[in-house]
UniProtKB/Swiss-Prot annotation:
Residue runs in coiled coils: 438-478
Segments forming CCHC-type zinc fingers: 502-519
Name of the protein: Gag polyprotein
Outcome of substituting residue 212 to A: No effect on reverse transcription activity
UniProt GO MF annotations: RNA binding; structural constituent of virion; zinc ion binding
Signal sequence range: none
Length: 538
């Protein structure tokens, strides 16, 4: 029976949830398919000895990291999250990685026992400390000092000879207690953890700090201007916490502008910044717009290749920032780069997009105005802060506000003389007087009850009216029937012929009256027939 071989790559795939969690702690995201591709196909081609099955060897991880973070076209920005996660697994290993980490630092000894001298550091492959590395601290080693802005002088960046690489393992804090020497107190610590991008001489190394910061150009101890390059955490926090240039060019342009002002980056730093925050197509568009902004000696835009290349070169120039001329070139380059960002971020005029910005149901007028102004900046060539555009912005603010606010703003007296600030204040008053959701629910409930009560009352009144009308009609019908019978009876009597003065009403003969009529029968009178009446039941 064969036995399954566990490799670093298969180990990470088997604990992929932990790998994703560690990557998230590094503010990056990793995908399993690309993780396998980079480990087994990409990094072995860097010629640093990376095995296809992966490794937790810190020296090899450091060498791959140098290749990945190389500035310019030789770097691999898309692989940064993956090598940073590999580095975190090796330098701060979880329990399932610790048995595979090699070489493993020596365990710390109790402070009371004399420590054995450590073996001299081996010659190791180059290691860049451009970015922070998480290393287990020794028990007796004090916390490394974080350099302040007034730290020791940095070394010249523009020379081409690389410095000797330091040993990746942290040196011991002191020598053997039986005669070993402690580190001299007067020795200055290494002024920068960014070893791969500094050139020239180096001070004696100390343990790396677990944090790194990017500083602007500053004067060192000898008065020479030096700088600290960007850190990976800064670059990728900027990338992950801001929208893309295509999605919101204004916000990303403002971020890059603040970085250009505070950090005063060199030409190489600008390329690294653009390569991290922009896509390839966005970067080419920005560079093209920046070169269009180059002006000639007459102050007008020029298209002369020599003047454009001198002001905004596409290849690394030989500008020495320690000289006034070099600093002037860098300042002009940053100004052109900012102009390129602003011009490339402008979208074609689209007033329909501006008209599509309407106030939300619970959005304050101030927030709505900011969105409206941002739409003007993004979709039109007009500046909403320009006094000449205040009328257009005011009309858009009125027409595109919430219906209740817009109606009241349109009825304001002397509307044409109102400024945009006046309209916003009036809109805020209307917005603040709106009923709360609880008040609205109570009003709707009360109106519903009142409506039901009115409908019930109206139904009762209609029913009573129908009953009265029915009784009235039946009464009329009954009265008509009774009146008809009476008229028939009375009418029959009235149809008798008129008698003379001496004529008998019974026999119609003259000479006597009916009471004396001999032809009239004598005797008791019979019962009179009763008249039938029509009742409501009939």
């Amino acid at each position: 029976m064969g036995q399954t071989v566990t490799t670093p790559l298969s180990l990470t795939l088997g604990h992929w949830k932990d790998v994703e969690r560690i990557a998230h702690n590094q503010s990056v995201d990793v995908k399993k398919r690309r993780w396998v591709t980079f480990c087994s196909a990409e990094w072995p081609t860097f010629n640093v000895g990376w095995p296809r099955d992966g490794t937790f060897n810190r020296d090899l991880i450091t060498q791959v990291k140098i290749k990945v973070f190389s500035p310019g076209p030789h770097g691999h920005p898309d692989q940064v999250p993956y090598i940073v996660t590999w580095e975190a697994l090796a330098f701060d290993p979880p329990p399932w990685v610790k048995p595979f980490v090699h070489p493993k630092p020596p365990p710390p000894l109790p402070p009371s026992a004399p420590s054995l001298p450590l073996e001299p550091p081996r010659s190791t492959p180059p290691r860049s400390s451009l970015y922070p590395a998480l290393t287990p601290s020794l028990g007796a080693k004090p916390k490394p000092q974080v350099l302040s802005d007034s730290g020791g002088p940095l070394i010249d960046l523009l020379t081409e000879d690389p410095p000797p690489y330091r040993d990746p393992r942290p040196p011991p804090s002191d020598r053997d207690g039986n005669g070993g020497e402690a580190t001299p107190a007067g020795e200055a610590p290494d002024p920068s953890p960014m070893a791969s991008r500094l050139r020239g001489r180096r001070e004696p190394p100390v343990a790396d700090s677990t944090t790194s910061q990017a500083f602007p150009l500053r004067a060192g101890g000898n008065g020479q201007l030096q700088y600290w390059p960007f850190s990976s955490s800064d670059l990728y926090n900027w990338k992950n916490n801001n929208p893309s240039f295509s999605e919101d060019p204004g916000k990303l342009t403002a971020l890059i502008e603040s970085v250009l002002i505070t950090h005063q980056p060199t030409w190489d730093d600008c390329q690294q910044l653009l390569g991290t925050l922009l896509t390839g197509e966005e970067k080419q568009r920005v560079l093209l717009e920046a070169r269009k902004a180059v002006r000639g000696d007459d102050g007008r835009p020029t298209q002369l290749p020599n003047e454009v290349d001198a002001a905004f070169p596409l290849e690394r120039p030989d500008w020495d920032y320690t000289t006034q001329a070099g600093r002037n070139h860098l300042v002009h380059y940053r100004q052109l780069l900012l102009a390129g960002l602003q011009n490339a971020g402008r979208s074609p005029t689209n007033l329909a997009k501006v008209k599509g910005i309407t106030q939300g149901p619970n959005e304050s007028p101030s927030a709505f105005l900011e969105r409206l102004k941002e739409a003007y900046r993004r979709y039109t060539p007009y500046d909403p802060e320009d006094p000449g555009q205040e009328t257009n912005v005011s009309m858009s603010f009125i027409w595109q506000s919430a219906p209740d606010i817009g109606r009241k703003l349109e009825r304001l007296e002397d509307l044409k003389n109102k400024t945009l600030g006046d309209l916003v204040r009036e809109a805020e008053k209307i917005f603040n007087k709106r009923e709360t959701p609880e008040e609205r629910e109570e009003r709707i409930r009360r109106e519903t009850e009142e409506k039901e009560e009115r409908r019930r009352t109206e139904d009762e009144q209609k029913e009573k009216e129908r009953d009265r009308r029915r009784h009235r009609e039946m009464s009329k019908l009954l009265a008509t029937v009774v009146s008809g019978q009476k008229q028939d009876r009375q009418g029959g009597e009235r149809r008798r012929s008129q008698l003379d003065r001496d004529q008998c009403a019974y026999c119609k003969e003259k000479g006597h009256w009916a009471k004396d009529c001999p032809k009239k029968p004598r005797g008791p009178r019979g019962p009179r027939p009763q008249t039938s009446l029509l009742t409501l039941d009939d």
